[in-house]
UniProtKB/Swiss-Prot annotation:
Most taste cells may be activated by a limited number of bitter compounds; individual taste cells can discriminate among bitter stimuli. It is found in: Membrane. This is Taste receptor type 2 member 10. GO terms for molecular function: bitter taste receptor activity; G protein-coupled receptor activity. The lineage of its organism: Eukaryota, Metazoa, Chordata, Craniata, Vertebrata. The gene is TAS2R10. InterPro entries: TAS2R. Residues 1-6, 64-100, 148-179, 249-257 are extracellular. It comes from Papio hamadryas. Gene3D superfamilies: Rhodopsin 7-helix transmembrane proteins. One of its GO terms (cellular component) is plasma membrane.
Amino acid sequence: MLSVVEGILILVVISESVFGVLGNGFIGLVNCIDCAKNKLSTIGFILTGLAISRIFLIWIIITDGFIQIFSPDVYASGNLIEYISYFWVITNQSSIWFATSLSIFYFLKIANFSNYIFLWLKSRINRVLPLLMGFLLISCLLNFAYIVKILNDLKMKNDTVWRLNMYKSEYFIKQLLLNLGVIFFFTLSLITSVLLIISLWRHNRQMQSNVTGLRDSITEAHVKAMKVLISFIILFILYFIGIAIEISYFTVPENKLLLIFGMTTTAIYPWGHSFILILGNSKLKQASLRVLQQLKCCEERKNLRAT
């Protein structure tokens, strides 16, 4: 039986999941329509991949969490936890990779530095994306091999319990090794986002001496971009904090509140960042306003028919 606090957090997680699927589904739909019109750009490809991977990631977070909370015995056979582990690696790594690619793309497109390496990368932005794809593939293959090793070791020990029956220190070391690829992309994304914020801030200071009208419009755009980046960094950090909380649940499996709180914290990022992207991207924002306008018109027609 769940406590009141646990029940409230479960409702929050469900709400986050619904918003996440709707927000990312909208992003994916808008860019898929552009793809059908042969208008899909590099940024559109990244946003589409990010949206699709996050939808699957949300389902994995919810499915895995609810099984652990309500039916932990389902994992006793070992097969389900194996499939979920594989799927988790694919969706989590893909989501982080696309988020990192988005950060790098904006960094190379918008930032302004005189550094030779930066200028070299900026002139070869179309080659950076395939390079990151190669890193993702290597990271996924390494993690797959490591997961297979862990699960095979458990089967050889005839450990039929879904919880990893090992010392706490050993478990955390295995999780750290398993997430090395993700940590690399996470660090890279944070570095590029911080550098872009610094570049925007410096450029904003340089614009202070320009004409007032131009200065105000550019300053507003820069402040908006910095707010989006700072929000992204905060949500990204919360996502990894949530994962750490969920990992720590394995050491105290009787504390369901810890797991539910971890799920709530983890799910903030995939849905929160999707709405930040919609509000920060002019094309997505205009499309969302058109959808809201259509919904408003439909509601008005329905009210007129009712009267």
